[in-house]
């Protein structure tokens, strides 16, 4: 979108909030907004004056930094800097060993987090799947425990309700050394789904208020569907969901000025009226990133996704297209890598393929160095029109600088055939298995692991 189009959508979002209002299903959030100058009618219909929104922009940080377990700032969410990771809570997994589509277990979360820890192009981790072999009411607590134990990378949590989020944050505080350390060097953020831009459920508001109160970054994402809970047209969908994003921003800043806030950059997908499926690999999903650029706020994005049911040509094509598109528009936290079947199924092999694609994209976006050394005019002069560069020192010094795949195949046909003629899916599955056998995540100290177990056990008694 152009800056003028973004401006029009911003004004439309302000009008939606001021004229039509939103339903909020949490008394504390309503009271907070009312004390800030919002109008409340019909119990929970809240209208937000535009001045309240503009004031929130004066206090919210324009830059958020996520840290790893060692306290190192590894994810500065700013400008067009892109960081990549998987998604959460898929109901199915394609077993990389058997090819079977099945229900996941907690062991799959462990393997997925171990894989994220090992892959150099994966910057953060999410749970990937919903384990079916644990108490579903507190599955998010078990996920958080595994995530904190099996990777040192930043984490995007997903919690079902406030109690699970509190437990996960307590675990993170135990890992880094206390709540003050976690606030100064956040290892975690939480992805909060809202029913829609104008319908804010109690659970989402509770989590937003909790994170903002603690000074931890919140990801506030209206989960609208085009043609169902928001207009089917891209502009109308963005305007309505952006109103929800702005409402979340106001609440966070009223709760605590300066609370870090990460907005969504994901366009609501239109329902496919032929299949009644909400597609993930929709080509216009990334246009919401223009609003993040317009506001100068960090943004959540998506990529590496597919509506395919298998790790096949469609899955690879859609993963590559969505990753490239989101990288070009500058999504800061690009999640959902490895998603298949419109977010219902996850594949570790697909995640490995996405990691390879990211390497290609980063090389593509990295540009070219133009210096006397790289222009190599002296080497060209020495070689002459009929010479070659294979024996030149310049070639020896620089040939490794070009991106080289570790998974995609560049051999000739005979070599490929002699090596078994394996498909990309087969090679990716083998890579997954090799990593799981060889990689050992940095363990937590025994006392910290014990504290995480104690918190998880406490969740079972809630």
Task: Enumerate the language-model features and the residues they cover.
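Catalytic-core signal marking the mid-to-C-terminal active-site face
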Residues: 1-12, 20, 25-32, 47, ...
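Flexible, glycine/charged-enriched surface loops at secondary-structure junctions
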Residues: 23-30, 42-43, 123, 182-184, ...
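Helix-rich catalytic cores of soluble enzyme domains
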Residues: 103-332
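Short acidic (Asp/Glu) and glycine-rich catalytic loops that position anionic groups and cofactors
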Residues: 34-39, 187, 225, 266-270, ...
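Hydrophobic alpha-helical scaffolding
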Residues: 2-3, 19-22, 43-46, 102, ...
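Glycine-rich, N-terminal phosphate-binding loop and its surrounding beta-alpha-beta segment
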Residues: 31-100
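Hydrophobic alpha-helical bundle architecture
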Residues: 289-390
């Amino acid at each position: 979108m152009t800056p003028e189009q973004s401006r029009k959508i911003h004004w439309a979002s302000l009008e939606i909030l001021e004229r039509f209002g939103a339903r909020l299903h949490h008394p504390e959030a309503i009271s907070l907004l009312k004390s800030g100058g919002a109008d409340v009618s019909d119990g929970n219909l809240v209208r937000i004056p535009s001045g309240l929104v503009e004031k929130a922009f004066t206090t919210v940080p324009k830059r958020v930094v996520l840290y790893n377990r060692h306290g190192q700032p590894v994810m500065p969410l700013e400008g067009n800097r892109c960081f990549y990771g998987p998604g959460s809570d898929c109901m199915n997994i394609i077993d990389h060993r058997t090819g079977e589509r099945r229900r996941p277990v907690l062991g799959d979360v462990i393997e997925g987090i171990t894989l994220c820890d090992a892959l150099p192009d994966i910057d953060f981790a999410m749970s990937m799947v919903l384990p079916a072999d644990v108490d579903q009411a507190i599955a998010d607590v078990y996920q958080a425990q595994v995530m904190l134990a099996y990777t040192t990378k930043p984490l995007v949590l997903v919690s079902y309700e406030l109690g699970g989020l509190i437990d996960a944050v307590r675990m993170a505080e135990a890992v880094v050394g206390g709540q003050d350390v976690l606030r100064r060097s956040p290892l975690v953020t939480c992805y909060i789904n809202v029913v829609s831009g104008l319908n804010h459920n109690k659970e989402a508001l509770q989590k937003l208020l909790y994170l903002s109160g603690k000074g931890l970054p919140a990801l506030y994402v209206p989960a609208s569907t085009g043609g169902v809970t928001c207009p089917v047209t891209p502009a109308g969908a963005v305007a309505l969901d952006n109103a929800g994003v702005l409402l979340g921003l106001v609440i966070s800043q009223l709760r605590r000025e300066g609370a870090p806030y990460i907005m969504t950059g994901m366009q609501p997908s239109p329902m496919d009226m032929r299949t009644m499926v909400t597609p993930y690999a929709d080509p216009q999903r990334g246009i919401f990133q223009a609003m993040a650029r317009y506001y100068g706020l960090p943004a959540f994005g998506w990529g590496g996704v597919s509506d395919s049911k298998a790790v096949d040509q469609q899955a690879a094509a859609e993963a590559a297209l969505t990753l490239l598109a989101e990288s070009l528009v500058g999504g800061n936290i690009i999640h959902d890598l490895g998603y298949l079947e419109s977010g219902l199924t996850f594949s570790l092999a697909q995640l490995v393929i996405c990691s390879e694609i990211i390497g290609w994209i980063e090389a593509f976006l990295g540009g070219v160095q133009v210096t006397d050394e790289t222009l190599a005019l002296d080497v060209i002069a020495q070689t002459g029109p009929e010479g070659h560069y294979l024996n030149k020192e310049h070639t020896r010094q620089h040939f490794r600088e070009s991106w080289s795949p570790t998974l995609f195949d560049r051999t000739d046909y005979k070599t490929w055939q002699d090596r078994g003629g394996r498909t990309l899916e087969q090679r990716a599955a083998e890579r997954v298995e090799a990593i799981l056998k060889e990689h050992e995540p940095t363990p937590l100290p025994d006392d910290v692991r014990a504290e995480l177990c104690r918190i998880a056990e406490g969740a079972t008694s809630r």
